[in-house]
UniProtKB/Swiss-Prot annotation:
Belongs to the class-II aminoacyl-tRNA synthetase family. Phe-tRNA synthetase alpha subunit type 1 subfamily. This is Phenylalanine--tRNA ligase alpha subunit. GO terms for molecular function: ATP binding; magnesium ion binding; phenylalanine-tRNA ligase activity; tRNA binding. Tetramer of two alpha and two beta subunits. It comes from Pasteurella multocida (strain Pm70). Binds 2 magnesium ions per tetramer. Its EC number is 6.1.1.20. GO terms for biological process: phenylalanyl-tRNA aminoacylation. The keyword Aminoacyl-tRNA synthetase applies. The keyword ATP-binding applies. CDD domains: PheRS_alpha_core. PROSITE patterns: AA_TRNA_LIGASE_II.
Length: 327
């Protein structure tokens, strides 16, 4: 029994000195495993006389249970300490203010496109689209633009070959629409266009929205009234608007439209005109029966004027300090 007391004391001491779960598990195997001293003592009962065997067995069980209880308590202590350490490491100061969630916003160019298309869709104009890689027929020929026109030159247009180019305007959408639809036609064509130019007010890629209206009674007076209403709604001001005679191969008569700026100067905002009879003939519409008007506007130009932006290139530099102003 002296040996039993010694084993029990050693087990209790080892358990008390265990610093983590791994060390405690090693002690469990050492003292309570199949080859441990408590197991050996129980196996040694066969050498004890039958009369003394019950009492000796009881003492061994009591000692083993004492050590087992100590081991269980130590295990709880270590697990609790480990949990507390983990909680302390991960604790959150609930008195701190929460972090603000950054939400995205629409790009100012997208906002302008949405604003323009919403206005005209309420007047019955539907959105049409077309390819950005266009043929010279749809980009130039069908629009009454002659072969010698400077817009066809390499310094203005990105050509793939003599017949394919990056479209310089969304007017090709008008031609494709008139080929497949019969008047009355009332469409708008927003999209990307490309020109070989880059400075403070020009970029190689920009956005354009064109309008086309074809009907038997389409006239310039109706066009002027439509654009007056649009510009005042877009800028949310009762602006002064003027129409200046101009020249576009695909419209006749043609005009450029200006608005009076806050600095007292006229600012050009878009071009327009009555669809040229040759353009109508090119798509099989009789110009003696139908007339039409077309409008072309640069989205970035409108956006710059609405939000007082001085450099068009800022729209494409992905500077969050700039873009956050429009959220």
């Amino acid at each position: 029994m002296q040996n039993l007391e010694q084993i029990t004391e050693q087990a209790l001491d080892a358990i008390a000195r265990a610093e983590d779960g791994k060390a405690l598990d090693a002690i469990r195997v050492e003292y309570f495993g199949k080859k441990g001293p408590f197991t050996a003592l129980m196996q040694g009962l066969r050498d004890v006389s039958p009369e003394a065997r019950p009492a000796v067995g009881q003492k061994i069980n009591d000692a083993k249970q004492l050590a087992q209880n100590a081991l269980n308590e130590k295990k709880v202590q270590l697990e609790t300490a480990e949990l507390n350490a983990q909680l302390a490491k991960e604790k959150i100061d609930v008195s701190l203010p929460g972090r603000k969630v950054e939400t995205g916003g629409l790009h100012p160019v997208t906002m302008t496109i949405d604003r323009v298309t919403k206005f005209f869709s309420e007047l019955g104009f539907s959105v049409e689209s077309g390819p950005e890689i266009e043929s010279d027929y749809y980009n130039f020929d069908a629009l009454n633009i002659p072969k010698h026109h400077p817009a066809r030159a390499d310094h203005d247009t990105f050509w793939f070959n003599p017949e394919l180019l990056l479209r310089t305007q969304t007017s090709g959408v008008q031609i494709r629409t008139m080929e497949k639809m019969q008047p009355p036609i009332r469409i708008m064509a927003p999209g990307r266009v490309y020109r070989n130019d880059y400075d403070q007010t020009h970029t190689p890629m920009f956005h354009q929205i064109e309008l086309l209206y074809v009907d038997k009674k389409a006239n310039f007076t109706e066009l002027k009234g439509l654009l007056h209403d649009f510009l005042r709604a877009f800028f949310e001001e009762d602006l002064q608007v003027r129409f200046r005679p101009s020249y576009f191969p695909f419209t006749e008569p043609s005009a450029e439209v200006d608005v009076m700026g806050k600095n007292g100067k006229w600012l050009e905002v878009l071009g327009c005109g009555m669809v040229h009879p040759n353009v109508l003939r090119n798509v099989g519409i009789d110009p003696n029966e139908y007339a039409g008007f077309a409008v072309g506007m640069g989205v970035e130009r409108l956006t710059m004027l609405r939000y007082n932006v001085t450099d068009l290139r800022a729209f494409f530099e992905n500077d969050l300090r700039f873009l956050k102003q429009f959220k």
